[in-house]
Design a protein with these regions (language model features):
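Transmembrane alpha-helix termini and helix-breaking/packing motifs in multi-pass membrane transporters
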Residues: 31-37, 89-95, 153-173, 245-247, ...
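Hydrophobic alpha-helical transmembrane segments
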Residues: 100-111, 138-194, 201, 255, ...
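Substrate-agnostic recognition of the 12-TM MFS/MFS-like secondary transporter fold
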Residues: 11-27, 51-64, 70-82, 102-160, ...
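A single, central transmembrane helix in multi-pass transporters
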Residues: 29, 165-172, 210-269
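Juxtamembrane intracellular "pre-TM" segments in multi-pass secondary transporters
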Residues: 1-10, 190-223
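C-terminal transmembrane bundle of multi-pass solute transporters/carriers
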Residues: 57-61, 68, 72-77, 88, ...
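Juxtamembrane helix-start elements in MFS-like secondary transporters
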Residues: 40-48, 103, 136, 250-258
């Protein structure tokens, strides 16, 4: 009985992990391959920018595809198409048929199908969590733990794979992860949509935006978290590196600081998964926002390495629970027939927040 209740959620989490670890490995292997193939930083930058734009567009429209065609078909197609796109890169390169524009086309195709696949998986989490006897808050936190573990372990795994096999075969491994994630998703997810959709307008982002705007809790919560995520993302990718460079600090210190923040975030999510249901979301967010503000103020002084690492872990710990809290609120307050579009809208806006 216990296995029947937990196995669907475990299968979906396995698909999520494969998807995330594949993307984390590709985030290292793909730039390495592009630079080796094109010998141009400009082409590497163009490839990265094209990938981000394709991912955001895929997030905008992907939720509507999930709600219209069903979760299993979208998960399967996203995984297979993304895998084929990644596998095409080393295969075309092996036969000497990979041009720079063809390389970008493969990357864009794979990136565009990332978000629909994740929306298909995430839309079913509340139901499978209920079957497993877990609260929405705990399921949301467990999913975040899986994503963070993949994000932390992916670069190390990617570096080892590139060192042993090379960048091209490593991209083949990411393709395998994508296809397997799609197959697992198709196996455990429902094939039919939550409700039949008859108009193409509902495929757009408008339905998701309209619902978020009209929902009295989600509207302010989403706005606050979006700003917070944008600031935290800018801190990690722009502000802290700039401070380190201006102060003449070592790049190894920056790398260790980033790792400590990631480890702290993982611990924060794990704590929220364990005791989050006992504490109100309002109190969690108040502690996260105020604590991270104080931590960021102290970080701006660039203290010695031990204190710097401790502050990095502390800020990560405090901010780790923010995303699971938002996701849990979305799961609790969004009708099933709208969940794909709402998740797609949230994903697209969050992806846009940090670059802006």
């Amino acid at each position: 009985m216990s296995e029947r209740r937990y196995s669907p959620l475990a299968t979906l989490f396995a698909a999520t992990f494969l998807f995330r670890i594949g993307n984390a490995v590709a985030a290292l292997a793909l730039p390495w391959f592009v630079l080796s193939h094109t010998k141009s930083a400009a082409w590497a930058g163009a490839t990265a920018a094209s990938s981000v734009i394709a991912t955001i567009i895929g997030a905008w429209v992907g939720g509507g595809l999930v709600d219209r065609f069903g979760r299993a078909p979208v998960a399967l197609i996203s995984g297979v198409v993304g895998g084929v796109a990644m596998a095409s890169i080393p295969l075309l390169d092996a036969v000497g048929a990979l041009s720079n524009t063809g390389l970008i086309a493969c990357v864009v195709l794979g990136a565009a199908f990332d978000a629909p696949g994740m929306a298909a998986q995430d839309s079913e989490l509340p139901k499978l969590g209920h079957v497993a006897g877990l609260s929405v808050e705990r399921v949301s936190s467990l999913k975040a733990v899986i994503g963070n573990v993949a994000s932390l372990g992916g670069p190390a795994l990617g570096g080892a794979a590139i060192g042993l096999l090379g960048a091209a075969p490593t991209l083949g491994l990411t393709a395998f992860c994508s296809v397997l994630a799609g197959l697992l998703g198709a196996w455990v997810l429902p094939a039919r949509a939550a409700r039949t959709m008859t108009t193409t307008a509902t495929l757009s982002m408008r339905a998701g935006v309209a619902f978020l705007w009209s929902e009295p809790l989600l509207r302010p919560l989403f706005g606050i978290v979006m700003i917070f995520v944008g600031i935290v993302g800018a801190n990690g990718s722009v502000i802290m590196p700039a401070l380190f460079v201006d102060a003449g600090r070592q790049v190894a210190e920056l790398g260790l600081f980033s790792s400590m923040m990631g480890a702290g975030g993982l611990l924060g999510i794990a704590i929220h998964a364990s005791v989050g249901a006992r504490i109100s979301a309002q109190n969690w967010l108040a502690v996260a926002f105020c604590g991270s503000a104080v931590g960021s103020l102290l970080l701006s002084q660039l203290p010695g390495v031990p204190v710097l690492m401790l502050l990095g872990a502390l800020v990560g710990l405090l901010t780790g629970s923010v995303s699971p809290i938002l996701n849990a609120a979305i799961y609790n307050r969004t009708p099933p027939e709208l969940l794909g579009r709402v998740l797609g809208t949230v994903s697209a806006v969050m992806l846009s927040a940090s670059p802006m």
